[in-house]
Design a protein with these regions (language model features):
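Acidic/polar-rich alpha-helix caps and helix-coil junctions
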Residues: 1-157
Length: 157
């Protein structure tokens, strides 16, 4: 945004997010190691590019033994790590229809200092979470439904 004569550049989407979305789409369309349309990057190469940039280099064992059957689990794990603190997780879980993970309690860490140093204790931060199947989809605004007789509200809303 612009403030007086100074420009502030703020990234709306990072290259890692683009590459992980690309890897997910390529995997669903062609598998993890095919690029039949000639886009220049397979799904597995997109993930490797992120891992290389992060400093894992050529000896990275993260993708060892990966197959088309378990590749998406690796993409999900990489998104969780690479995009942590960027508020993608909730929407990723909804897109993947993995809402059951949203029902699990949130676990935090209580850190206390004592004579021998720091002591870490796992604590439950929130256990009353509720996620129903209808929550995978947003409700359609009532105004939109009233304007068209062909549009119906998403189930559950």
């Amino acid at each position: 945004f612009r403030s007086g004569t100074v420009f502030h550049l703020f990234p709306m989407i990072r290259l890692s997010d683009i590459l992980l979305s690309y890897a997910e789409a390529m995997h669903h369309a062609y598998g993890m190691s095919a690029d039949p349309e000639g886009y220049g990057l397979t799904a597995i190469e997109a993930v490797q590019k992120i891992r290389t940039r992060a400093g894992f280099g050529t000896n990275d064992k993260f993708l060892n033994g990966v197959t088309d059957n378990n590749f998406m689990e690796k993409v999900k794990q990489e998104r969780r790590i690479e995009l942590c603190f960027e508020e993608h997780r909730y929407f990723d879980l909804r897109r993947w229809m993995d809402g059951n993970q949203l029902k699990e309690p949130i676990i935090g860490m209580k850190v206390e200092e004592n004579a021998s140093g720091l002591h870490y204790t796992r604590i439950t931060v929130d256990e009353a979470r509720n996620f129903k199947d209808y929550m995978y989809y947003h409700p359609i605004p009532l105004k939109v439904i009233k304007e068209s007789p062909y549009i119906q509200q998403n189930p559950g809303w």
